[in-house]
């Protein structure tokens, strides 16, 4: 009845039963959620961002995901709700002074404390390792524990002083119920943003059409008194009266080229009190004037000789 060696097998060793459900190690799950990027599965390194559902990402991984235009994106379901870089918020994290990182166990002869976290709450001092609920503000990106938010009730951020609303508080790595609530808020927020854009478009079109109307009639409108026909006739008569005056002034100013306006400026050298030797240098002197008999007919002369 027994096998070799006197062993007796039992029924469950011979007959295959239903498979047992494998239980996920909670500690390993918490380490994966709080220390690794949800998109690239790499260790979180600054700058660290969070989406509207409370998941942690490396900013470089999110940018690469958005730039990737291929049809098949690796782990696309984890970030399918991220359409642009505006859908994530860069987190302002407070370092844990007790965390040594990789320097504490360089030789491999020490126990790694997985519960030791890199970041802590700046208000209460709790470590951000998954044992305590943490949240961040979408308006400023500051991260602190949920206990600090409940104990110190205020409408202002505890670290930077920025004002926030209840809708801005997002739980990091929350439960399935928390994710459902955050997803409903996200969809409502995006729908509201679309409606605001639609309402802004007709206003922008009106603002563009208003300058066209103003170009036709710029400046304030002036009320004209009296009949328009009379005013137009008066203006024509004034123009006709001014026309001859302007022509006369133009003729007086144009005149002969080179003639001075005042007669006092033109004077003869003969009237001056200079010596006769000086006066003989000019053509107006009596010695320069010759009669037709004295001048030869074949000699070229100018008008100054007469």
From Swiss-Prot:
Undergoes proteasomal degradation, via DDI1 and DDI2. Removal from stalled replisomes and degradation are required for genome stability. InterPro entries: Rtf2, Rtf2_RING-finger. Pfam families: Rtf2. Residues 193-276 are annotated as: Disordered. Residues 226-240 have a biased composition (Basic and acidic residues). CDD domains: RING-like_Rtf2 (cd16653). GO terms for cellular component: nucleus; replication fork. It is found in: Chromosome. Interacts with DDI2; probably also interacts with DDI1. This is Replication termination factor 2. It comes from Macaca fascicularis (Crab-eating macaque).
């Amino acid at each position: 009845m027994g096998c070799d060696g006197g062993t007796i097998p039992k029924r469950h060793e011979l007959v295959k039963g239903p498979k047992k459900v494998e239980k996920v190690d909670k500690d390993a799950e918490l380490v994966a959620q709080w220390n690794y990027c949800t998109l690239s599965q790499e260790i979180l390194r600054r700058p660290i961002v969070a989406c509207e559902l409370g998941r942690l990402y490396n900013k470089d991984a999110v940018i690469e995901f958005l730039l990737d235009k291929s049809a098949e994106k690796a782990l696309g379901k984890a970030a399918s709700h991220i359409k642009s870089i505006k859908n994530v918020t860069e987190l302002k994290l407070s370092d844990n002074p007790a965390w040594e990182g990789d320097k504490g166990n360089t030789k491999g002869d020490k126990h790694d404390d997985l519960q030791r976290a890199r970041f802590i709450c700046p208000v209460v001092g709790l470590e951000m390792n998954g044992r305590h609920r943490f949240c961040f503000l979408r308006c400023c990106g500051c991260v602190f524990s949920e206990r600090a938010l409940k104990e110190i009730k205020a409408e202002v951020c505890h670290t930077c002083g920025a004002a926030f609303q209840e809708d801005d508080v997002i739980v990091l790595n929350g439960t399935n119920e928390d994710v459902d609530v955050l997803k409903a808020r996200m969809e409502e927020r995006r729908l509201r943003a679309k409606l605001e854009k639609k309402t802004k478009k007709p206003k922008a079109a009106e603002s563009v059409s208003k300058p066209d109307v103003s170009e036709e009639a710029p400046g304030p409108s002036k009320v004209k008194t009296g009949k328009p026909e009379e005013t137009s006739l008066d203006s024509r008569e004034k123009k006709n009266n001014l026309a001859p005056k302007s022509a006369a002034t133009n003729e007086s100013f144009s005149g002969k080229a080179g003639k001075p306006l005042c007669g006092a400026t033109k004077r003869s050298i003969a009237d001056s009190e200079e010596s006769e030797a000086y006066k003989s240098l000019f053509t107006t002197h009596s010695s320069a004037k010759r009669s037709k008999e004295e001048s030869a007919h074949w000699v070229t002369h100018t008008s100054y000789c007469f």
